[in-house]
Amino acid sequence: MKERTIQPVNNGLNGNITIPGDKSISHRAVMFGAIAEGKTTIKGFLPGADCLSTISCFKEMGVDIVQNGDEVTVVGKGLEGLQEPKAVLDVGNSGTTIRLMSGILANTPFFSCVQGDASIAKRPMKRVTNPLKQMGANIDGREEGTFTPLTIRGGDLKAIEYTSPVASAQVKSAILLAGLRAEGVTAVTEPHISRDHTERMLEAFGVKVTREGKTVKLAGGQKLTATDVQVPGDVSSAAFFLVAGAIIPNSKLVLENVGMNPTRTGIIDVLEKMGATFTVEPINEGASEPAANITIETSSLKGIEIGGDIIPRLIDEIPVIALAATQAEGITVIKDAHELKVKETNRIDTVVAELTKLGARIEATDDGMIIYGKSVLKGNTVNSYGDHRIGMMLAIAGCLAEGKTTIEDAEAVGVSYPTFFEELQKLAK
């Protein structure tokens, strides 16, 4: 278990930073390339542990994939060309891999067994396995398919019209991917619109997808045609530096190539509402996944209320939004965020516990947290508990705290941002 010591940043964070590739888009580019016909080249791929797990699983199913840094070539097998894996498919720490891949495996006529690490073993799979079973897939797991390992015997599926109890891009994507080889039109309706990378990328690969309000539909029997994918920077990774630029005194940062998919930019809306000073310069208008350069500088923030439809657009950014709120004048209330409980950790509990250790005034609620600003943070020993987003949030907090902060289990950040600590060090000079 590796530790990292963070010293206070006295002269602010300054400079330009190119944000690494979007994790959600990198996963999908590899998966869709694997089931497409032809060769897909991916540029800007995120070579973090989670996305490498996706590559490894599809290689196990006979797909020819060559990865060189942030460039990946996938020679697709088509929807019917995947081979039965001889070994267990290991997704590591990646919830995206297991949930989306389950949709693909559900319609593939062979047997597979899928498992992950200790964190994956605690995450609920029934939200995906139940609708896939309704389509006709034969899936089992611990506690009737609630937890991994999962065994999947795929085959002929029937389309369903599914109303999801949660706004989850992973649930929606698994059902749509299963629907590619199902008989009929598959439809998924959500309580709020979740991130739409799957829909955008399926369209880029030649699949006709229909969107009507909170419902997404596709007809079975459509083929994917290989296409080249340019992955923009991950706004969830950018969020840590956006908040750092806003709350650490004497800072000015330019974040280059940040993905600006409107289903993901809740963090931008929240920072604007809190009073942050920043500019957004679009750089690839017309692309299926928009991107921009963002300049942000030290700002006076104020507390706000965050809840409702915006939550699915910033669910992964809530840990660092909570940190921003500790430096805002007044009270910030985060609600409707039950999904935080089923992430890599229960993020309501871990955010509250670890920020409290640093001197923040913050309390947990059933569906979020209440943060009382403005707090003076003081260095302490804290723990990521193996959660990459908690680890990065604590590192930014450490830059601001008085005295040194030691982060236990700091290597967890490599899941989504392998160069995070090096970038932070560079900007602090």
Swiss-Prot record:
It comes from the Bacteria. GO terms for biological process: amino acid biosynthetic process; aromatic amino acid family biosynthetic process; chorismate biosynthetic process. The keyword Ligase does not apply. Phosphoenolpyruvate binds at K23, G95, R123, Q170, R347, R389. 3-phosphoshikimate binds at K23, S24, R28, S168, Q170, D316, K343. The keyword Transferase applies. One of its GO terms (molecular function) is 3-phosphoshikimate 1-carboxyvinyltransferase activity. PANTHER family: AROM/DEHYDROQUINATE SYNTHASE, PENTAFUNCTIONAL AROM POLYPEPTIDE. Belongs to the EPSP synthase family. Catalyzes the transfer of the enolpyruvyl moiety of phosphoenolpyruvate (PEP) to the 5-hydroxyl of shikimate-3-phosphate (S3P) to produce enolpyruvyl shikimate-3-phosphate and inorganic phosphate. Monomer. This is 3-phosphoshikimate 1-carboxyvinyltransferase. It comes from Bacillus cereus (strain ZK / E33L).
